[in-house]
Amino acid sequence: MNTPSSPAHFIRNIIEEDNRTGKWNGRVETRFPPEPNGYLHIGHAKSICLNFGLALEYGGVCHLRFDDTNPEKEAQEYVDAIIESVRWLGFDWKEHLYYASDYFDQLYEFAEYLITQGKAYVDSLSADEIRRLRGTLTEAGTNSPYRDRSAEENLDLFRRMRAGEFPDGVHVLRARIDMASPNINLRDPVIYRIRHIHHQRTGDKWCIYPMYDYTHCISDALERITHSLCTLEFEDHRPLYDWVLDQLAEKIPCHPQQIEFARLNLTYSVMSKRKLIDLVENKLVDGWNDPRMNTLAGLRRRGYTPESIRLFAERIGISKADSWIDMTILEDCLREDLNERALRRIAVLDPVSLIIDNFPDGHEETCYAPNHPQKPELGTRELRLTKQLYIDREDFMEIPNKGFFRLAPGAEVRLRYAFIIKCTHVVKDDQGKILEIHCVYDPDTKSGTAGAETRKVRGNIHWLSATYAKAVEIRLYDRLFIDSHPDTEGKDFKISLNPNSKEVITGYVEPSLCEAQPEQRFQFERHGYFVADLADTGPGKPIFNRTVSLRNTWKK
């Protein structure tokens, strides 16, 4: 896999220093630990590229581990989608696929050990009472009345919790740390709770489940992770990460280092999984893989390439400071990649009939268009010119504005790869809509011949033969939100939805495009980049999605 060049950043500097001092004996093991309660989005791609990229760069491995400790919200559908998305991005975890539930037995044994060491206790307060006694950022918490239960009583209660004797919410297991700590995460955090619910992998074996802060540091240690990379919201959780591993130092093979970096904040997007679920469940989009969604499944269906997303992740870099990344950076990475790989084709999206009156009836001219103007080795394709053509309606103006150099009454333009034509008159319906544009052509001006150089015109428009063009469904996608910051706190993000984010039309394309395969990408000349829809394209019946326009049309 080709990866962009790797500029220095603070995490790479940490790894370099660790390798210099021999801290991990040259090992670099990272992990990407998603919770299977939704589809991955572009923000996850930054973490995926960072974790897998660093492991690849330093000859290490990156684990894919599912944090499946909350069975109420998790499903196999999400596991499968996450696996597919990480693979699609171009990364391979080899044999290192893990689940937090793989460690449930060890996590339970470690919890019993913490109880025997006086480092954990069973609390019988309600969730509301625990929250009330936790205190605030400026006030210390208050000890639970159950904090001083004996180790024997705690062990008995914890085992009975596991045996299923108690309903949900009656007891929890808490770490005994410091209720007066200035870090609220160290005020006796809950590490186990009762949940009588079926787990997708362990079935009904367990009715108590470990909390994330307890689980993920131990999972890291058991997998011998060296550098545990997470986003900045976990910075205040790092003391708890270290506390748990310090208490279990005799039980675990290593103590990984947690390192935080700034998450991705992308304009015109929402990253909250809760809000993405809201969009899907309220049918404001057509599922998790809707091409307007910033999920990796949606971006893939929109026509994004893995290479463009990896380029984006590298280009925005890694830092400790939160900042906003403009959507145009992502789109420019996509344009840069598609400009290299997409074959050129012609499509007429809003057709109007054009008739060349002096073109002989039944006659055809073969014209030649390059498959890629920067790559002559990809050859040319044939376009058939006939008496009746389709052009895009926007390429004609009956009363042209100043600076309009396309077709107008009395004006001349070149038909791309073909001849110069001149508009003579138009035919309209009773409502004044133009039905036909009538022209004459100059047969001595065919592109690629000596005559093409004898006359120059400023306008150059694309066209398709009405005889050979094929009608197809084309979906014109645009940004899902009209507000650059729809996720602003205190604002209903749904009021920023773009009512014009999807338009379905019937357009005309070159006949060869009827054989387009799902995910095959093209540049529709003068329009933008399009892809044959991954989900809905059938044999001989492609549906094309607009991936991105040729240039940014959004005002900053």
UniProtKB/Swiss-Prot annotation:
GO cellular component: cytosol
Entries under PROSITE patterns matching the protein: AA_TRNA_LIGASE_I (PS00178)
The EC number(s) this enzyme carries: 6.1.1.18
InterPro entries: Gln-tRNA-synth (IPR004514), Gln/Glu-tRNA_Ligase (IPR050132), Gln_tRNA_ligase_bac (IPR022861), Glu/Gln-tRNA-synth (IPR000924), Glu/Gln-tRNA-synth_Ib_cat-dom (IPR020058), Glu/Gln-tRNA-synth_Ib_codon-bd (IPR020059), Rbsml_bL25/Gln-tRNA_synth_N (IPR020056), Ribosomal_bL25/Gln-tRNA_synth (IPR011035)
Pfam families the record matches: tRNA-synt_1c, tRNA-synt_1c_C, tRNA-synt_1c_C2
Subcellular location(s) per record: Cytoplasm
Motif 'HIGH' region, chain ranges: 34-44
Positions of ATP binding: 35-37, 41-47, 231, 263-264, 271-273
Binding, L-glutamine: D67, Y212
Reaction catalysis annotation: tRNA(Gln) + L-glutamine + ATP = L-glutaminyl-tRNA(Gln) + AMP + diphosphate
UniProtKB keywords: Aminoacyl-tRNA synthetase, ATP-binding, Cytoplasm, Ligase, Nucleotide-binding, Protein biosynthesis
Top enzyme category: ligase
GO molecular function: ATP binding; glutamine-tRNA ligase activity
Span of the annotated motif 'KMSKS' region: 270-274
GO biological process, one term: glutaminyl-tRNA aminoacylation
The protein's assembly and partners: Monomer.
Family: Belongs to the class-I aminoacyl-tRNA synthetase family.
Name by which UniProt lists this protein: Glutamine--tRNA ligase
Originating organism: Nitrosomonas europaea (strain ATCC 19718 / CIP 103999 / KCTC 2705 / NBRC 14298)
Name of the gene encoding the protein in the UniProt record: glnS1
